[in-house]
């Protein structure tokens, strides 16, 4: 267990929290982390690429010339692959690039990503975001007070509409929940700002 300061939104210390070394203090497994990032990026691919094969290209129903007697090579259709404007052989077809990863590996990847952020001093724990209404200017001031870099991932315990709307128009700032935390978002961010309740929830899931 390691102690971390819990900050108020004005930057002052409100207390401390013990975070489990099993979640936030392991030696990052780079190979599993790399595999998890590739898996997530692969699942984001649309896979809608397609070309027309000889059956999909329009035309070509008539035989170009008779089979014998012309001295030329026999041809059955002008949409065969060797013809200009013909179908493509073995071209890309629509498919899903998604693949699966064992649950233990996925959890190890998340723990590795969180531990990596801790090692880089990229983890900030706050007591809570108590926004009564969406306030982008106020949210920017909070990030500035907490001395956060441009790319920040904000993690709340549950969905918080006011926080999401406050951060929506700030470039480089992304908001997610403890349940929706993923490796790609963590590694893309320079810093992680997590609420005390969200940190405990992450420990419950990954611990």
From Swiss-Prot:
One of its GO terms (molecular function) is structural constituent of ribosome. GO terms for cellular component: ribonucleoprotein complex; ribosome. GO terms for biological process: translation. Residues 50-76 are annotated as: Disordered. It comes from the Bacteria. Belongs to the universal ribosomal protein uL4 family. Keywords: Ribonucleoprotein, Ribosomal protein, RNA-binding, rRNA-binding. InterPro entries: Ribosomal_uL4 (IPR002136), Ribosomal_uL4-like (IPR013005), Ribosomal_uL4_dom_sf (IPR023574). Part of the 50S ribosomal subunit. This is Large ribosomal subunit protein uL4. Pfam families: Ribosomal_L4. The gene is rplD. One of the primary rRNA binding proteins, this protein initially binds near the 5'-end of the 23S rRNA. It is important during the early stages of 50S assembly. It makes multiple contacts with different domains of the 23S rRNA in the assembled 50S subunit and ribosome.
């Amino acid at each position: 267990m390691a102690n971390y300061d819990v900050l108020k939104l004005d930057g002052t210390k409100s207390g401390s929290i013990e975070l489990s070394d099993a979640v936030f203090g392991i030696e990052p497994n780079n190979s599993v982390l790399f595999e998890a990032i590739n898996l997530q990026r692969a699942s984001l691919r649309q896979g809608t690429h397609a070309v027309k094969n000889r059956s999909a290209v329009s035309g070509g129903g008539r035989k170009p010339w008779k089979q014998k007697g012309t001295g030329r090579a026999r041809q059955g259709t002008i949409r065969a692959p060797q013809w200009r404007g013909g179908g493509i052989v073995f071209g890309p077809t629509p498919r899903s690039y998604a693949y699966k990863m064992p649950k233990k590996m996925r959890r190890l990847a998340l723990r590795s990503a969180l531990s990596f952020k801790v090692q880089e001093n990229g983890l900030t724990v706050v007591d809570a975001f108590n926004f009564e209404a969406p306030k982008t200017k106020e949210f920017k001031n909070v990030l500035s007070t907490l001395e956060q870099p441009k790319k920040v991932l904000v993690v709340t315990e549950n969905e918080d509409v006011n926080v999401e709307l406050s951060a929506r128009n700030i470039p480089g700032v992304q908001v997610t929940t403890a349940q929706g935390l993923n490796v790609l978002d963590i590694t893309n961010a320079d810093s992680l700002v997590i609420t005390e309740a969200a940190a405990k929830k992450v420990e419950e899931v990954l611990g």
